[in-house]
Amino acid sequence: MKKLKIEIDEMDVDHQNQWTANDLADMLTHQNHSQLNQNERLTFLYPAVDHTLVKVPSSLSASDKSSWIETQNVNPFQCKYTESPRTLYNRDDDVGSIRTSDPIPSECGIYYFEMCVLNDGEDGAVSIGLTSKGTNLNHQPGWDRHTWGYHGDDGNFFKEDGGYGKKYGPVYGKDDVVGCGLNLISRSCFFTKNGKFLGVAVRNLPVIEYYPTIGVHSKDECVEVNLGQKPFLYNIAMEKILYNAHQKDMAKKTS
């Protein structure tokens, strides 16, 4: 821990956000503050946000969702596909997608959320990504304009495109934890699988409001979304540190 503290002091990262060297050392060792409640964790991860005035996504919307998805009463972070009366998975308009109640504040800098696939159903047609307000929630994230998504059945990334997407990462399914990160500074998006960074999926994102979004599209598919109510599997705090350090290093090289 002492060595990490010295390294962080030398990096001189994120003093503007009032993180102490000990705080940052804890993050680097992935001691993800499991004792914190959701509000405390979100405040810790996004210290530049005035949490008394601005909401960071902390819940799934009760209304901004497809009719083909339902949240569970016992656990409001769990979502399940509601079986369509039509032949499943051969139609493009009976996807069950859901957004968070609030958009991602720009002050977050780098925002992150995860989902755990509890059941990948008949087809494994689960997705995670970002959408803007008003986009079609009967479609998967990534199929329409101002939507982006990483899909579990083929591992492809979809960028505002209803086609086949592009090869991005591994497929994922039952018991996998998949995360989505939005870098509001570089206007880029990345994903993780089981705590491992998969790389940047898209750059030069438009300046709009982004909502964390997940989609399900076959019988019995069920996921649990993590919006900071518990520790993330991926160490997003370290990602923020490394990004800030890289930015400062680049600034020194160009000055």
Residue ranges and their predicted role:
Residues M1-S255:
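PRY/SPRY (B30.2) beta-sandwich protein-interaction domains
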